[in-house]
């Protein structure tokens, strides 16, 4: 690693120390000697041989807090790596769930394959968050070695190459092309995360992929829902979003003010209240969750349980429920390197006195898809919810309602 690179990462490590000391919700930092750890990781940084190892030192420093919402976002990479596959937890087991047509992954993997190991890492619920962070943000891989079990239980190994898409390491915001790319880099992600509602008989099935809607968007959605007797709110795969969006969602489901919980920040504790307004949906409510339902999804599911408002069905949730802010950093003048830190600035304690971080929400009815369901494209969980809603929807048809949308490369 060059001297300039060493200095760049040393600045990042120092900023990580300072942002946490300034903004982290727990002034005691869980009893950690943060400055002593900084000195320790500064020593580790001197041994880093390249940028990747340097980034891992910064990430490991923040991981000492063992907090799902506090982490390092490395600089914009000169290459984008598309794996061509998606994987997800079902219970304590990881499965391949999606394959990009035409990718190397599609020629070697099968939907429904159980992922035993990825490039030497054993994949399970306990380490799943760290594995996702490593492969997707911290150290994207140009190839992945898999140890797999087919839906029939047959073991095999596969070596899957990722697709490399080149882009600039440094964006020059005085360059019109670079500026356009910077301003539009999130548009395709937003399109893929859009909310969708399907009406079948007396039920509305609302696929809410993120809590990213404003009050007007939520009001329009509830305008559709109000026409039906049952709402199936599908929060599977929903990682969370903004607390304001959660408040508006809760307000649309209850005829009274609802305390989401207490926001315990560094200096004070304040109640978070969803104020009811207008005409709430008063019909039957079924909420679907899975292991990828995080943050606001978990809060909403637990509120439904605490308030006895409906039934929660599916898998135990992600257990990643804190409130954080992202602090962006740059190095360089006109030609900038962008990176930053997510820092938890509040703990959310629910009205029953419990914190969902590291515990999650256990559904009222535990119901998981099988490997065979995944392989065949069946959604047995949604089909069961439809049955409870009094509508006919077989697992095959349920699996086709909300097809996965790959972003263009």
What are these language model-derived features?
Residues 28-94, 143, 151-196, 393-409:
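Extended, small/polar residue-biased N-terminal targeting/export presequences
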Residues 3-29:
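Mature N-terminal segment immediately following signal peptide/propeptide cleavage
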Residues 105-129, 232-234, 304-307, 312-314, ...:
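Conserved PDZ fold ligand-binding element
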Residues 8-13, 20, 37, 41, ...:
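Stable alpha-helical elements in mature extracytoplasmic
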Residues 141-334:
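Cleft-lining beta-strand/loop regions that shape enzyme active-site pockets
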Residues 20-28, 41, 45-52, 62-69, ...:
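Sec/Tat-exported extracytoplasmic proteins
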Residues 364-405:
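Low-complexity, Gly/Ser/Thr/Pro-rich intrinsically disordered linker/tail segments
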Residues 77-129, 213:
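PDZ/PDZ-like domain segments forming the peptide/carboxylate-binding groove
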